[in-house]
């Protein structure tokens, strides 16, 4: 898919559904890779796969989001006190 778990990402939780009109996937993972590098990976993946991509900061998170037709993605990223990067990746109709 367009938005895999980041290489060297350690999945903490994953969930999804294909019921109804919207396929939804949610994955939370941690990585030792710096936050900016992980965010750049998803920004590049979005653009390379024809998605729009916007980066904002809100409530302590870095957020990259975008759409392509009826498909959408959101990446919430933060640096943990331990130094690890934590990412919540949400996709719909990927």
Regions found by a protein language model. Give the residues of each.
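An acidic-aromatic pocket/loop used at catalytic or ligand-binding sites
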Residues: 1-94
């Amino acid at each position: 898919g367009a938005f895999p778990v980041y290489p060297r990402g350690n999945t903490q939780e994953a969930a999804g559904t294909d019921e109804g009109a919207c396929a939804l996937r949610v994955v939370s993972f941690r990585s030792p890779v710096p936050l900016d590098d992980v965010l750049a990976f998803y920004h590049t993946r979005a653009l390379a796969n024809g998605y729009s991509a916007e980066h904002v900061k809100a409530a302590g998170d870095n957020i990259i989001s975008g759409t392509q037709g009826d498909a959408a993605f959101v990446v919430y990223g933060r640096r943990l006190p331990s130094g690890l990067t934590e990412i919540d990746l949400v996709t719909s109709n990927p």
